[in-house]
Design a protein with these regions (language model features):
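Short, solvent-exposed amphipathic alpha-helical segments in soluble enzyme
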Residues: 1, 24-26, 65-78, 135-140, ...
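Conformationally flexible catalytic loops at phosphate/diphosphate-handling active centers
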Residues: 1-49, 210-227
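Short internal beta-strands
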Residues: 10, 79-85, 148-151, 334-337
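Glycine-rich beta-alpha junction loops
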Residues: 11-16, 59-61, 87, 154, ...
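Anionic-ligand anchoring segments at beta-strand to alpha-helix junctions in alpha/beta enzyme folds, i.e.
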Residues: 35, 42, 48-120, 246-291
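Glycine-rich, acidic loop regions that bind phosphate or pyrophosphate groups
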Residues: 87-206, 327
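Thiamine diphosphate
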Residues: 111-114, 160, 166-168, 172-176, ...
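Active-site diphosphate/adenylate-binding microenvironment
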Residues: 202-302
Length: 361
């Protein structure tokens, strides 16, 4: 078993026209590293002395089954836990220390809390740009904080942000090692004030998010305002996400596609366990949502699944329609945001009010 990533299988053409014998190679298990001794101790010392530690969980926490380990570390420190863009399943949503996702259309609570950090533990994340870019007018990345970055891939450490300590290792193992290496007084500095601030900040953001019905127009544009005036009885994407979130089963698996309609949803779904949020990430493959959720249902036929896509992205996935229509395939739920346009491209491609080739019939 190797690190998670895409795989390609090449099958010679003549193999499809005959019965063949194959021998499957034996699975080789690799022991994942838990980090270097000196780096771990340096990181543990920084966390032990931190006055406002913050943990940022990435996909590595999910892939390493490290969510319980990161929770134990967070609880020892009473550190708020954020997650990377579209990795909302990297920490239990009901946990009082969970501050939500960073990045595009993420959690303002998470952004405000990490901006106060003096030490950030970036656990199992490459710190990709979409997970650290400003949001809601807040340039929140704590430029003066000590950054501890943990990644199984050494090439990613320090790639996008300056780091104080880099640890090459499995996120779960590193979290466990750090917890066992903390000093007796770790987390004690400002603990009560920090816990109160986390609760207050989360509550304020939850109320604000509930009241956000529409997207604001970019300076110089009026797309959203005109869309609301044209169809005042239609739900906005934010209204739809709120309604879906309220009705969604707690154990559901969801998939997302690219585009603004789905990206708006970064602030809404939360999960109690990992491998519940399938998202295209920075690769940005248009048409990802439908086939991803179909695959999830085949793998987990007894778990409810919900896919999300805009009408443009969904239109790219018509091959999958022939597959899911087969009687032996389990049923899936697919939510289509219908705005009859390539909305993200239309929003960013204009001269005055003239738009070309971005409408869908």
């Amino acid at each position: 078993k190797r690190a998670s990533g895409p795989a390609q299988i090449n099958i010679p053409r003549d193999f499809w026209t005959q019965v063949i014998d194959i021998e499957l190679p034996k699975i080789v298990e690799f022991e994942r590293p838990s980090g270097g001794k000196d780096a771990l101790q340096h990181a543990a010392d920084l966390l032990s002395e931190a006055k406002f530690p913050v943990i940022l969980n990435g996909a590595g926490v999910v892939l390493s089954t490290g969510i319980p380990a990161s929770a134990a570390l967070a609880e020892r420190l009473d550190a708020p836990v954020c997650c990377g863009y579209q990795h909302n399943d990297a920490f239990p949503g009901s946990h009082p220390l969970f501050a939500g996702p960073l990045g595009y259309n993420g959690s303002k609570a998470g952004m405000e809390l990490i901006s106060k950090a003096d030490v950030v533990l970036a656990l199992g994340t490459r710190l990709n740009p979409f997970s650290t870019l400003p949001g809601y007018g807040i340039d929140y990345w704590p430029k003066d904080a000590k950054i501890i970055q943990v990644d199984i891939n050494a090439d990613r450490i320090g790639l996008t942000k300056d780091v104080t300590v880099g640890i090459v290792g499995d996120a779960k193992k590193v979290a466990e090692e750090l917890l066992s290496s903390l000093s007796d007084h770790a987390g004690e500095a400002n603990r009560a004030d920090r816990k109160a601030m986390i609760a207050k900040t989360k509550s304020a953001w939850a109320q604000e998010l509930t009241s956000m019905d529409h997207e604001d127009d970019d300076p110089g544009t009026t797309w959203n305002e005109r869309a609301r005036s044209d169809k005042p009885d239609h739900m906005s994407p934010r209204m739809a996400w709120r309604a879906i979130q309220a009705a969604m089963p707690n154990n559901a698996i969801i998939s997302s596609d690219i585009g603004n309609n789905c990206a708006i949803g970064n602030a809404y779904p939360s999960f109690e366990e990992g491998r519940k949020y399938l998202a295209p990430g920075l690769f940005g493959p248009c048409g990802y949502g439908f086939p991803a959720i179909a695959g999830a249902k085949i793998a987990q036929p007894n778990v409810p699944v919900i896919g999300f896509a805009g009408d443009g992205a969904f239109g790219i996935s018509m091959n999958e329609m022939t597959a899911v229509g087969r009687g032996e395939w389990p049923a899936i739920t697919m939510v289509i945001f219908r705005n009859y346009q390539w909305g993200a491209e239309k929003r960013n491609t204009h001269y005055g009010l003239q738009i070309t080739l971005l409408e869908l019939s």
